[in-house]
């Protein structure tokens, strides 16, 4: 199962890297973009969210800090273009990082591969702005829980984990070629409930870095008198259809304790979402969400054995398929940027049984493959607190009237 998990996570990351264009938009010259290479240092505080991090570990010391070094390549829309005005100087690229928690024996020193995107929140001058940035990818090189060799580690259950990061920072272009960035961010590591334990690790702290701009000109740093005309956005309704699948682990309550099932359970589902396109950057709508969750309503039962034998044998039992299907309705909102769309959803299952009843929340990243198709990477949370399942799939957009943006 471990090899299967590693294989699928690698496939997902490779798919993301493949879909990120080498030349940002077909038919456009590379001179329409500023190419950048950046380095960052990120000292972080580790939130004590589980006993292992609080000090119940081999050293009996809390794990409170981490440090990460990042190397990043990106391309950016040039200032004073249509794309720059619409998307706020958006940039996107790929990065690698190395993180240490000061305890290589129990946690390892994981390295991450990720895609990222950022843009302006506010501009104070042609050289100074407040920006945001998110990172998403995979981290490897962890020392996971092992019943014999690493039994204290209740935070990390797999050698590869998702890496999610978001932050804000001040960007100062202090010369034609160099930018200084100073800000803060939040990071989350977890395996998406694909393996136990999955307490995860959360950090927050500072980021400071230097960015080299290969082909930026002095004109790019000056205020232009010319403002390109932005085409009026045609408001319309588009329709997204997503098919997804994944696998998950499940904890089953036995009395007052939760017992981890040794099995991995399949998950498959669909979303059908009519979305009203308000403008270049926002969509809102609703979604019909169907799912088959092979772990739903799994239970553990005592089997009576003959007198004098060993203790009762306990098995994890699956109910009929009608107890593992659900149909829900959710409200959706999406933030649309070049190549990437970030979506959130909140809904409730209207046709469901047992532990599938209740509210659910969705966070999703859509990565453009063609004009009307995309990769879908999402996560489903139940009742704002219980990890549910990954949503890895492919989506198609119909009646798409989103205009092409010149830059």
Where are these regions (language model features)?
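Transmembrane beta-strands of outer-membrane beta-barrel pores
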Residues: 41-47, 75, 96-102, 136-144, ...
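Residues on the lipid-exposed face of transmembrane beta-strands in outer-membrane beta-barrel proteins
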Residues: 39, 69-75, 115-121, 134-138, ...
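Outer-membrane beta-barrel translocator/channel fold
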Residues: 35, 40-59, 83-85, 130-164, ...
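Outer-membrane beta-barrel "beta-signal"
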Residues: 202-223, 387-407
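Surface-exposed strand-loop-strand hairpins of Gram-negative outer-membrane beta-barrel proteins
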Residues: 46-68, 106-107, 249-271
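Repeated loop/turn-to-beta-strand initiation elements of outer-membrane beta-barrel proteins
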Residues: 47, 80-82, 172, 176-180, ...
């Amino acid at each position: 199962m471990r090899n299967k998990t590693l294989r699928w996570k690698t496939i997902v990351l490779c798919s993301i890297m493949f879909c990120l264009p080498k030349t940002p938009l077909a038919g456009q010259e590379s001179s329409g973009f500023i190419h950048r290479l950046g380095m960052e240092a990120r000292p972080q505080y580790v939130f004590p969210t589980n006993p292992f991090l609080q000090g119940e570990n081999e050293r009996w010391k809390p794990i409170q800090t981490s440090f990460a070094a990042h190397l990043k390549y990106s391309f950016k829309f040039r200032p004073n273009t249509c794309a720059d005005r619409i998307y706020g100087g958006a940039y996107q690229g790929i990065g690698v990082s190395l993180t240490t928690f000061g305890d290589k024996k129990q946690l390892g020193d994981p390295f991450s591969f990720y895609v990222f995107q950022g843009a302006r929140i506010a501009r104070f001058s042609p050289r100074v702005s407040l920006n945001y940035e998110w990172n998403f990818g995979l981290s490897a090189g962890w020392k996971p829980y092992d019943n014999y060799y690493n039994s204290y580690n209740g935070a990390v259950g797999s050698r590869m984990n998702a890496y999610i990061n978001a932050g804000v920072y001040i960007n100062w272009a202090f010369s034609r070629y160099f930018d200084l960035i100073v800000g803060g961010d939040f990071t989350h590591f977890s395996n998406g409930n694909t393996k136990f334990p999955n307490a995860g690790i959360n950090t927050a702290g500072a980021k400071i870095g230097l960015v080299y701009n290969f082909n930026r000109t002095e004109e790019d740093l000056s205020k232009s008198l010319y403002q390109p005309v932005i085409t009026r956005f045609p408001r319309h309704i588009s329709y997204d259809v997503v098919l997804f699948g994944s696998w998950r682990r499940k904890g089953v309550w036995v009395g007052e304790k939760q017992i981890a099932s040794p099995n991995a359970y399949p998950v498959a589902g669909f979303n059908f979402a009519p979305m009203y396109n308000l403008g270049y950057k926002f969509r809102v709508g609703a979604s019909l969400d169907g799912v088959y969750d092979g772990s739903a309503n799994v239970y553990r039962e005592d089997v009576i054995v003959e007198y004098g034998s060993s203790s009762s044998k306990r098995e994890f039992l699956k109910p009929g398929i009608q107890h593992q299907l659900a149909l829900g309705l959710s409200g959706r909102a999406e933030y649309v940027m070049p190549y990437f769309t970030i979506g959130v959803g909140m809904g409730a299952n209207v046709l469901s049984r047992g532990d599938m009843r209740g509210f659910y929340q969705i966070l999703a990243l859509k990565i453009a493959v063609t004009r009307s198709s995309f990769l879908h990477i999402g996560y489903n949370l139940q009742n704002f607190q219980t990890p549910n399942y990954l949503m890895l799939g492919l989506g198609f957009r119909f009646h798409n009237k989103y205009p092409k943006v010149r830059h």
